[in-house]
Amino acid sequence: MSVQYSLSPQFMLLSNITQFSPIFYLTSFPGLEGIKHWIFIPFFFMYMVAISGNCFILIIIKTNPRLHTPMYYLLSLLALTDLGLCVSTLPTTMGIFWFNSHSIYFGACQIQMFCIHSFSFMESSVLLMMSFDRLVAICHPLRYSVIITGQQVVRAGLIVIFRGPVATIPIVLLLKAFPYCGSVVLSHSFCLHQEVIQLACTDITFNNLYGLMVVVFTVMLDLVLIALSYGLILHTVAGLASQEEQRRAFQTCTAPLCAVLVFFVPMMGLSLVHRFGKHAPPAIHLLMANVYLFVPPMLNPIIYSIKTKEIHRAIIKFLGLKKASK
């Protein structure tokens, strides 16, 4: 049963007139408008955990000189990326749930889309860097301090920062050239390229091919290299002499490996739904998009706080607990 949206005549007229710069209507959770304030409670909780958790990780690393090492510089970059990804969706989500503001101008939609996809590509790159860091630390421990230096991390970080936006800019700019003369309803709380491009009333083959190429040569390539890195790590760990050495080596990889799973599993699920689930209910698309954008920023600080001993000890010390002295 389709859901009807009561758009105002002014909204519809303005959307039809501004064919090349439409105003989109974000539905959020269609059919559940009556309980939207209750729906916002888990979203607000995830926002608070994600923002406070990642800020806390940054403060812990900043205030603890022992954590001023390449591994934790990469963790800081991951926390910053998670903050950016989380904050990118905040304006429209807050506007819908608290101010009943569902409309978004095309320019604002482009900016939000640019931020979401840029930070997604950046997070993929950071996870690749972290896997390479663990690969060198376990497979070549004696050369770690030579290969992985603070200067190398800064250079790699700059590449990561520019890689995401450079890959995203053409996707976003190409949307400006398309007319949008049909429906202007987006079944999300935010703008995603896969959803916006479907509203264009012209041939979008080139845009789809370019978007697929970008995903293959960024996210998918990163995933393959990450899998190879952890495959080599597991091979090296399996060859260690004692079980205690194997356990210690594997423990250093637990947190970054969990971060990889938390990020890539929802992303692959969302991609499969968009590519092959065109007839799936809108709620499925919406659920997968929210899991992909909200869960990694929320869980990453928790994972590193629990699974990384140095972070755990630094948190205890920062909070002034007695265990810090042990």
From Swiss-Prot:
It comes from the Eukaryota. The keyword Transmembrane helix applies. One of its GO terms (molecular function) is olfactory receptor activity. Residues 1-40, 98-110, 187-213, 274-282 are extracellular. Signal peptide: none annotated. InterPro entries: GPCR_Rhodpsn (IPR000276), GPCR_Rhodpsn_7TM (IPR017452), Olfact_rcpt (IPR000725), OR51/52/56-like (IPR050402). Glycans are attached at N16. It holds the Pfam family 7tm_4. It is a multi-pass membrane protein. Its main location: membrane. It is found in: Cell membrane. The chain crosses the membrane at residues 41-61, 77-97, 111-131, 166-186, 214-234, 253-273, 283-303. Disulfide bonds join C109-C201. Residues 62-76, 132-165, 235-252, 304-326 are cytoplasmic. GO terms for cellular component: membrane; plasma membrane. Keywords: Cell membrane, Disulfide bond, G-protein coupled receptor, Glycoprotein, Membrane, Olfaction, Receptor, Sensory transduction, Transducer, Transmembrane, Transmembrane helix. One of its GO terms (biological process) is sensory perception of smell. Belongs to the G-protein coupled receptor 1 family. Odorant receptor. This is Olfactory receptor 51M1. The lineage of its organism: Eukaryota, Metazoa, Chordata, Craniata, Vertebrata. The gene is OR51M1.
